[in-house]
Amino acid sequence: MSRLKTLVLLLFSCTYLFSEDLENYEVITVVSSIPKASNEIIIAVDKINRDFLDKTQPKDLSSLLRENLAIDVSSNGGIGQLSSTFLRGSNSNHTLVKVNGIKINPSTAGGASIYNLDSDLISNIEIGYGPLSAVHGSTALGGVIDISTRSQIQRSNSSVGFSIGPDSFGKELIRFNQQFTESSFLNIGLSRTNTDGYPVLTSSTLDRGYENTTIIGNLEVNSEFGNFELSSWSANGTVEYLVFGSPVSQEYENYAYGLENSNHVEGILSYKINVTTSKDLIEQNNPNFLGQLDLTNTKRDSLELIVSEMQIFNNPEDFVLGAHIEDEAVDYSSYGTLYEEKITTKSFFGSSYLSFLNTDINTSFRNSDHEIYKSNLSWNFEILKDLNESWRRGISRGSSFRSPVSSELFGFGGNVNLEPEINRSREINLKRTLQNADLSLLIFRSNFTNLINFDYQDYVLKNINKASNKGLEVRYKLQKEDWDLLMIVKAQDPKDETGNQLLRRSKKSASFTLSRELNGFIATANLSYFGERVDFGGINLPSFNLVNIALTKDFNKKFNLSLKLENIMDKDYFTAATSNDFYTNQGRSAWLKINYELGE
């Protein structure tokens, strides 16, 4: 604890070294229906842009979340292997993941397939922590990861890239941006990734490979009928893995397509209409013990209307109302359990923002009408008060939910009488936000109820479990002309109702990322630490720390070279285990990336 106090005091001192007038802030969209500047945000948020991704060179999204944001992420091996993300000590299926604002979580067991997202085609990531169902709907108990593939620089150019790494890793990347007119822009990206992989269990000698083809596209058109934006992300391929030590493989397909129309009706209101569709498909290549080829397929279609700037209010820009309808179709076959079901959820939601006497008040609500369990109300209430010109104190409370997914309702042990899982949380945040430096010190407490688990007496799933978490988080972000710093320290106590530590979640974690421009190079050093964790069967996962270094060099305006040295100390570390074995992670390795911009 003394080390943590010293670090906090150091961070507070650093902010005074770079005190400047408050001018420009990042715009945050993940925690409210009303986009806000970062100095108006109470809830903890991490925002990663393309510049940060280029400097740190993460090999995949899982490693970025773990090593640069101190988030607990468990992996069943290397690139493309199953991974689980635990935000704020919640379960892995309590994290909502969106691509271009479109939900990609499956309606079956487990979380979203973030391991199929190519980090080289991501433009920015926003992560909101805590209960956010009032803004995003079901699943946002622990938080939301919102990933954008939209190009942040609207100019005509094209580029090709190549990457190589250990275990015969190779990637080819093509990007194309076209500015047709001042009011129309297109960007397209394509990547192909292949790796032979390595043995994913300590007792295995079998390499487990991965193939991925990803295509992204965004078309923006501004006209007299409003602004139109078409977004697309698709990924497909093959992944090899182990089941009880035996080699198997599966084909996968993910996509998220959306069409958005926004417009302002002068003197009346502004509106936004979103039409989206997404898919999460897994097809096994090896038959189960019944001789059947299992599959899970979630198809989700949604329609959303958001109305803002309604002139009936005194400050119309500070009020938002919306309606959302979602149709979810699931085709499921697993070890003899088969079903096809459709579920419809209708929601009505709203947000408001008030400011007076140096105090900001944010409120959000959502009433969801689920076809099975009927109505549920989620909400957030936040107060942010100025203490002086630089310091602000925020207090927030919220309630969020996760609807039981189709496999819990209709699968093995299914129960159509299940209720939604609930998280009620509160948070106190002390913030110092400047033009080039942000400091956040917060404490939080979460209580999870109605958690779904298997009742071995009645041999059915029931809402029978509870869990809680409380903790402290410190974030410090500094951006200067030739160097950047991001430091995150977390201490928490995730436990079930019997007091046992929740599986695969650490009590302490930290990340330190420093980038410096030096002699034409950009050098980035990353240090991360995770405390002890526990896995199934009481297996202990030891604490570990990692050191990574990335070097980037622009030889001219067209040619760029990057080198990533990962796990420099060659640590053996584990984030997941089986009943009698550990899943392995990448040892010391080097990753090389070349990018060349075509044309003039």
Task: State the predicted function of each range.
Residues 27-54:
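N-terminal periplasmic "start-of-domain" segments of outer-membrane beta-barrel proteins
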Residues 61-64, 81-86, 98, 113-118, ...:
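N-terminal periplasmic accessory domains that precede
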Residues 102-130:
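Short acidic/polar hinge/loop motifs at secondary-structure boundaries
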Residues 146, 153-155, 163, 175-252, ...:
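Periplasmic-side early beta-strands and strand-to-turn transitions of outer-membrane beta-barrels
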Residues 354-361, 436, 444-447, 463-536, ...:
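Gram-negative outer-membrane beta-barrel transporters
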Residues 449, 552-600:
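C-terminal beta-signal and adjacent terminal beta-strands/loops
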